[in-house]
Amino acid sequence: MVSAGMNRDLLLVIAVSLSLIVIFARNLGKHIEGISSDFDKVSSFNFELDTAKNPSRLKEMVTLQQGLKVLSDSLQAFSRFVPIAVVRGIVNNDIDLNQKLNEKRLTLFFCDISGFTAIAERISSEKLVLQMQDFFEIVCQAVEEEGGTVDKFIGDAVMAFWGVDGDLDHPVRAARAALKVQDRIQNQCPLWIELGGEAMQVRIGLHTADVLVGTIGSPTRLNYTAIGDGVNVAARLEALNKDLGTKICISDSLFQATGGTLQVRSLGYQTMRGRHEPLLLYELLGLISN
């Protein structure tokens, strides 16, 4: 016969075991919920992972958490080399890497530092690198704030574009980004001088046109970019600022697309290098408030 004492001990063991199972299940459930939540975050390009703050001791869960962190870190690093909108499009299957270029109406943006070669000769390499990092940060932040895509850096120049997402307001947003860049660069100049660098002036060209946009390259290396005559025009507008004494040169096609919301000064018809037909151009001065 089983004594009453043994029954009590058996019931106590069962109760403790059940309590431990419940605690373990709850703890496991919390970790699973955390990993599921973090997967949702990564899919929406939010890289602040909760599981990194609350690591599990269970081997299988640790493996899952480590794999999730590798995925998050990889996407975050990838997004620094490729426009975030492109990475998101690839991950969400909105961008087909095998698809040919598509024609779209975009607003093209080129920004370049005036007299960069001379500046590079006058200040140390260390100070130049720090100033260039500030410059690129200012330009990229302004472009991204206005919903644009930073395409590439070309030496000290930045190429960006708007309109891939179907936003019809892209000419105004590009103009607003250009004005932000000029304003912020001007505000940054005193700090550069204080740190032993030099003041910088930037030139910007804006043009709205139908161009080809998409992935192009070789089987081993692709680039998501815009190509076409409109891209060349935007680059020429940026360079034309030097001859015209302007800071932001825009085309008539962009001006007409903004519906009279821009404050401009007419530059008349100008002939650009490599083009036979002159274009009506304007200097962008500001935005007309409603």
Spans of features found by a protein language model:
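Catalytic NTP-binding/metal-coordinating core of nucleotidyl cyclase/transferase enzymes
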Residues: 97-176, 224
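Cytosolic regulatory/linker segments at or just downstream of nucleotide-handling modules
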Residues: 211, 240-290
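Membrane-proximal coiled-coil signaling linkers
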Residues: 73-110
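Cytosolic-side ends of inner-membrane transmembrane helices, especially those
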Residues: 13-29
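Membrane-interface helix-start motif
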Residues: 1-10
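HAMP signal relay modules and closely related sensory coiled-coil linkers
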Residues: 27-73, 105
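A short glycine-enriched loop-to-beta-strand structural element that forms part of the catalytic core
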Residues: 160-161, 198-214, 249
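Alpha-helical scaffold within the catalytic cores of cyclic-nucleotide enzymes
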Residues: 132-148, 164-204, 229-240
